[in-house]
């Protein structure tokens, strides 16, 4: 049985929920889902330039959990860019955000 997911502090609320390659109809694209906590981890580490320990404290997760989130998110983003896939950002669960 999997452990219950600990609520994470998520401050990022993107204006769009889907990014896709230009000129390709959405129905023809494979779909990759990016979780809100993965996007928040990317924002803190890659956009704001925080160290992983600082970002983990801000999200209220362990440093290892943050590292796993960043790794998964980067893989998904690169996969979409290189293989022309649509990147969907999952809706934020109100229970897991501040």
Swiss-Prot record:
Instruction: Return the HAMAP family for the record.
Output: UPF0251
- Where in this chain does the entry annotate a coiled-coil region? none
What organism does the record attribute this protein to?
A: Vibrio cholerae serotype O1 (strain ATCC 39315 / El Tor Inaba N16961)
Family assignment from sequence similarity = Belongs to the UPF0251 family.
Listed transmembrane segments: none
Q: Which Pfam families match?
A: DUF134 (PF02001)
- Name used for this protein in its record: UPF0251 protein VC_A0091
- Listed InterPro entries: UPF0251
């Amino acid at each position: 049985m999997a452990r219950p997911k600990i609520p994470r502090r998520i401050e990022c609320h993107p204006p769009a929920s889907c990014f896709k390659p230009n000129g390709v109809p959405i129905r023809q694209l494979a779909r990759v889902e990016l979780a809100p906590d993965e996007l928040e981890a990317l924002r803190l580490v890659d956009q704001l330039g925080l160290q992983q320990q600082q970002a983990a404290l801000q999200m209220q997760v362990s440093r290892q959990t943050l590292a796993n989130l960043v790794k998964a998110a980067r893989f998904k983003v690169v996969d979409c860019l290189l293989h022309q896939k649509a990147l969907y950002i999952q809706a934020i669960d109100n229970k897991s955000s501040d």
